[in-house]
């Protein structure tokens, strides 16, 4: 037939299938010349930009495929052959985000991931196209101040190699200029109310000002990281904010990387922790790393043990044990597992012991504290019962009964199917249990269920 006739036939066959037809046109254009591809992509981007109809779930996949096809065409067919044009088109592609998100639900995150991929592509293309550092910085600035949907969240990091020192400094100065330009507050009668909170009206100018402040702070922090300027990073946080555990950890890690160990430890020690005793893991991990860097291994070990003791953190326990001398680790592990059995949250204790794994202790904990079992937490009790069933059928049965009892006592009709399955599993385990100790046998338990919940026919119909 020849390639020309074959192409014509394929286009005729694809009539009525718009995505396939667009894909064919792109491929045919690529066989012709990169300029033809660029023209096709430019036209398609313009069409998507002009579209105003809401994209429902029926059309969502088509949109995703369309966006991905345009992005891939820029990357695969243009980036290496026409890098300057590819760079311009990728900027245009990223500008689609606002119009797309304004008419599309992206609760799954699939669409935003396409734009995040495009940002990464932009960085690579910019290195090949080699635009002027100042122009690229200006484009980055204009994008960051219009980052309403988070499409440009990773832009600075992606562009660092192409921006170079001059571009980063230019972008920094533009952000500093923006920091001195607060959003104008209109007269009271001109202010636009866009929502309500417990504190009263939410005004458009307030949101715009918060966005400006956040944009400047995040951009200057990323630039500071790229320039290796720890003090500039720290300067973006006011003194009280630096005392928050998460922020203190971020600052301390940068001071640690700069070998400013005393300042790193001081930053962490000045933190104001929340009440309750639960570890702030980011803060704890940063402190452990700083202590290790200062050769304070005993203090670091004490922190690891404390994290385990307070939260049954398996990660911290493993890190603790592997640093102990031979034979000491066995004794410490036994002490840790005994602590887990006595831990305040029974479900957390069971989850830890099952995953460690220490199934004998998990079974012992279940049987000793069976009255505390909360059957609402099926996400923990179901895998625990599955793990315990082969060797510890009584503990598995008690875990299953807890979920059955909760479903029936609370009349959770939606869970009746699972509860019925759990009851059948209990019946299967019954033959392996030689001693129920102080607990009801399977037959007595089923009899009690029929007495207390006999009228719940929806459940019993599923059992049989």
Regions found by a protein language model. Give the residues of each.
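Eukaryote-biased, non-catalytic alpha-solenoid scaffold regions
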Residues: 1-464
């Amino acid at each position: 037939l020849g390639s020309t006739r074959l192409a014509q036939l394929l286009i005729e066959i694809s009539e009525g299938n718009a995505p396939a037809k667009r894909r064919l046109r792109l491929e045919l254009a690529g066989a012709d010349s990169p300029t033809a591809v660029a023209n096709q992509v430019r036209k398609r981007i313009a069409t998507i930009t002009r579209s105003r109809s809401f994209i429902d779930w029926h059309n969502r996949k088509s949109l995703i495929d369309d966006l991905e096809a345009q992005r891939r065409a820029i990357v695969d067919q243009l980036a290496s052959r026409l890098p300057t044009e590819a760079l311009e088109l990728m900027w245009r592609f990223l500008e689609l985000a606002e119009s797309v998100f304004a008419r599309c639900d992206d609760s799954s995150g699939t669409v935003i991931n396409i734009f995040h991929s495009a940002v990464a592509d932009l960085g690579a293309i910019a290195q090949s196209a080699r635009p002027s550092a100042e122009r690229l910085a200006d484009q980055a600035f204009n994008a960051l101040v219009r980052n309403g949907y988070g499409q440009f969240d990773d832009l600075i990091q992606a562009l660092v190699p192409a921006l170079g020192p001059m571009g980063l400094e230019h972008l920094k100065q533009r952000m500093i200029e923006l920091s001195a330009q607060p959003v104008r507050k209109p007269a009271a009668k001109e202010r636009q109310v866009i929502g309500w909170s417990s504190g009263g009206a939410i005004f458009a100018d307030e949101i715009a000002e918060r966005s400006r402040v956040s944009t400047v702070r995040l951009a200057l922090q990323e630039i500071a990281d790229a320039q290796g300027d720890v003090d500039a990073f720290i300067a973006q946080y006011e003194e009280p904010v630096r005392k928050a555990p998460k922020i203190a950890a971020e600052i301390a890690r940068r001071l640690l990387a700069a070998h400013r160990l005393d300042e790193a430890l001081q930053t962490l020690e000045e933190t104001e922790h929340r009440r309750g005793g639960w570890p702030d893991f980011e803060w704890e991990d940063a402190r452990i790393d700083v202590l290790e860097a200062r050769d304070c291994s005993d203090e670091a070990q004490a922190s690891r043990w404390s994290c385990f003791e307070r939260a049954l953190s398996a990660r911290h326990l493993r890190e603790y044990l592997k640093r102990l001398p031979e034979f000491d680790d066995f004794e410490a592990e036994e002490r840790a597992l005994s602590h887990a059995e006595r831990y305040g949250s029974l479900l957390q204790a069971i989850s830890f012991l099952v995953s460690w794994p220490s199934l004998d202790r998990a079974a012992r904990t279940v049987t000793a504290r069976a009255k505390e079992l909360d059957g609402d937490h099926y996400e923990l009790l179901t895998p625990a019962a599955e793990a315990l069933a082969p060797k510890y059928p009584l503990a598995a049965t008690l875990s299953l009964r807890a979920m059955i009892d909760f479903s029936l006592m609370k009349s959770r009709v939606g869970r009746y199917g699972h509860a019925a399955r759990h009851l059948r599993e209990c019946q299967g385990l019954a033959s392996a249990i030689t001693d129920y100790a102080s607990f009801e046998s399977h037959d007595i338990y089923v009899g009690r269920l029929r007495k207390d919940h006999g009228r719940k026919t929806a459940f019993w119909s599923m059992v049989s």
